[in-house]
Amino acid sequence: MKAPERDWLDVGLEPHTLHTLWAIRAAVALAHGVPVSTITGRDLDRTATRPRVAFYVAAIKARKWSLTQIGRAAGGRDHSTVKKCADRAMKRARTRA
């Protein structure tokens, strides 16, 4: 019997266990099976955007950093990009549940 597919936003992170954006970024990359450069890169395919958005969501949930700081750690993205992507992802996750 096949194991249930895990939601791509859930990377198994406890916010209190990760103390830096770089640790969150590395953990998300590991959970998604991609290199960190995929999260910081400019690719727009699903294999790059899903881990990137999961990083945004995990970093926002930790509540330690501003959207600008999160965007910089994600390869120089603007704070509005971080907010828009994370809001969309969290809204989709709520409607699926």
Predicted regions and their residues:
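Conserved catalytic core of nucleotide polymerization and phosphodiester-bond processing enzymes
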Residues: 13, 34, 67
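Small/polar glycine-rich anion-binding or flexible loop at a beta-alpha turn
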Residues: 42-47, 72-75
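Short, solvent-exposed alpha-helical "recognition" segments
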Residues: 84-97
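Short, amphipathic alpha-helical "recognition" segments used to contact nucleic acids or chromatin
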Residues: 48-65
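Short, basic interhelical loop/turn and adjoining N-cap
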Residues: 66-68, 72-85
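General nucleic-acid-binding
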Residues: 1-27
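Short, Lys/Arg-enriched N-terminal segment that forms or immediately precedes the first helix
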Residues: 31-45
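Residue-level preference for well-ordered alpha-helical positions
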Residues: 29, 60, 71-72
